[in-house]
Amino acid sequence: REDGSLLYHLPSVIDDIDEKITNIIRGEDHISNTAFHIQLFKSLNASVPKFAHHPFLTDNEGKGFSKRLGSLSINRLQESGYENITILNYLLNIGSNKDIIADKNISSLINNFDLKNISSSNPKFSIDVLKSLNKDILQSFNFDEISDRINLICDDLVDKKLWQFTKMNIDFFVEIKNWVDIIKSEKNFMKDTMDAKLIKAAIESLPEHPYNEDTWEVWTRKIKDLTGLKGKDLFMPLRKILTGMNNGP
């Protein structure tokens, strides 16, 4: 250049030679550059790396990334609560002819990755698919695998049984703290529910300790018989009483 700085091509090739690069994977916009780079490698009497070019990601409608979607860097996804292994799963399989499934084993993911499975068409990035995959990944963790992380944010308040319940109702790991706060808290949510008849029936029909897997069904059946409520008319206000939430399990 006029300012004395070097163009991209020669420094790139020299750097690859110096670092003994054997395989180069880059975007399809570099296809024309690759032919030129191969000639540079040969002119410098260097081994020519193997090249592969991947198609560009598009949004869910097949359009180029907008500035909004362009902000979805790996760091931003991590900050938003996506598990590292979720991101790795998604990136290794998006655009391939394989179904994206929850796999926590990094060695398995690496061994099963094959560039031949990558389609030449532009893959569509879907935040909904990524979120669903993150949920599947979390559900695949047993308590022993994740207990240390749980204790860091929940102060040893979560045991194996509680994890088995909460992991079915979270999209992101940090949400477990919300459930611990609800379950362990003594906050009274009944004042937020206007149905006095339902509250009275719920209190009067509450089964005695100890509670088990059948308690919920037995209890809600009694409330239904006492109030005549059913479906969402029963479960939505009951959820509000128990958790303070309008949506959830």
Predicted regions and their residues:
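C-terminal structured interaction module
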Residues: 245-249
